[in-house]
Amino acid sequence: MSGLGWMKENWRLLVITAVWIVAATSLAVKGVNLGLELKGGTMVIAKTDHPVSKKEMDQTVTVLESRLSTFGFKGIKIQPVGRDHIIVMLPGTPPKEAVELITKPGRFEAKYKGKTVITGQDIESVESPRIERVEGGYQWSVPFRLTAEGARKFAEVAKNAPGQPIDMYLDNKKVSSPRISEDLAMAAASGHMEREIEIVGGAKTKEQAEREAKEIMAVLRSGQLPAKLVPEGVYSVSATLGQNFLKMAMIAGAIAFAAVSVIIALRYRDIRISGPILFTGSSEVVFLIGLASLTGFTIDLPALAGIILSIGSGVDDLIVITDEIVRGERRKEEVTLRQRIKRAFSVVLASFATLAAAMAVLFVAGMGLLKGFAIMTIAGAFYGVVITRPVYADLLKKILGTE
């Protein structure tokens, strides 16, 4: 069979090639999110003003994740501790900025003459802010859409208040006081319920205007926290230690790959075996890093450990496969090559099942700080079993001429 024909038949090799291309493109365009330990940043330990239920704690995590992601932060990790503490880790974030966003209750109210007309519960969606230059600085606006009930309540006030201000508060701080236009009041009086509203503000610089608008948008989109959060500790984490660890891990990985290749070449007395091993191992690393880049998954120390573990378990599988193909051939066993490979893959699959079961328990158990470890380990092992191990076996057969 020609080399091209063999490649067409072995679709897994085409998958590996595609993975290399997609991963390289994604890394060049998007890069990869690094965790707090590798990039540095801020860790905030906060306490709720009263013990909360599990449901309320889960809601707190959801609100904070939405708020911080909307603001533009990447690599966020939030870990509840008990019923009244929460740890928030934000790579590359200034401490003051982090604390302000985390501790904002997010309570929105629109009042007319001191009486609440609409609240955050009446907001259906929030659009991206708009910034425009005006005399003396910059004006920002954050448009949002009311629910049908919110629009009804707003119309009840608007129809009798032409030219009057509606004061909008966020956490009891007035952020905007737009006036009800004559046209809006007349439309409300005729039964029209306006659902498109906006909060307007201003700042001296464009950067300040963008920040204020993004903060309003993030808080409105995420909603109100079920309990007030009080910071108990704010820590700036240096990236030096993590970066040194990352460099050492890369160097150690390269040395380990080279050492394994040499040892296997000596063991089986054939230097040609080293090539497929290096190709297979590097393909799995590229897959995992590319996957993290594409999905926005954060590579922190646990995730890095998961990558190392999946590669280590992969080397074990390669040795099992090599032993069956090479040594089985030399022993001239009365067993066909297909049967020997089948025997090797039964061991590989059993190893994967055991590893996946252990990692699944770790993931489901809710140990948030170790989920990255479990995800990377399972993803790497799965890709290896389905794609790279079969390709390795085929490459080895072709190189050794045992087909």
Swiss-Prot record:
Compartment(s): Cell membrane
InterPro entries referenced in this protein's UniProt entry, alphabetically: SecD/SecF_arch_bac, SecD/SecF_CS, SecD_arc, SecD_SecF_C, SecDF_P1_head
GO BP: intracellular protein transmembrane transport; protein targeting
Disulfide bonds: none
Keyword Repeat attributed: no
Residues annotated as transmembrane: 13-33, 245-265, 285-305, 306-326, 347-367, 368-388
Pfam families in UniProt: Sec_GG, SecD_SecF_C, SecDF_P1_head
Record's bilayer topology term: Multi-pass membrane protein
Coiled coil: none
Cellular compartments per GO CC: plasma membrane
Keyword Transmembrane helix part of the UniProt annotation: yes
Keywords: Cell membrane, Membrane, Protein transport, Translocation, Transmembrane, Transmembrane helix, Transport
Role, per record: Involved in protein export.
Subunit record text: Part of the protein translocation apparatus. Forms a complex with SecF.
Family: Belongs to the SecD/SecF family. SecD subfamily.
Protein name according to UniProt: Protein-export membrane protein SecD
Species for this entry: Methanopyrus kandleri (strain AV19 / DSM 6324 / JCM 9639 / NBRC 100938)
The gene coding this protein: secD
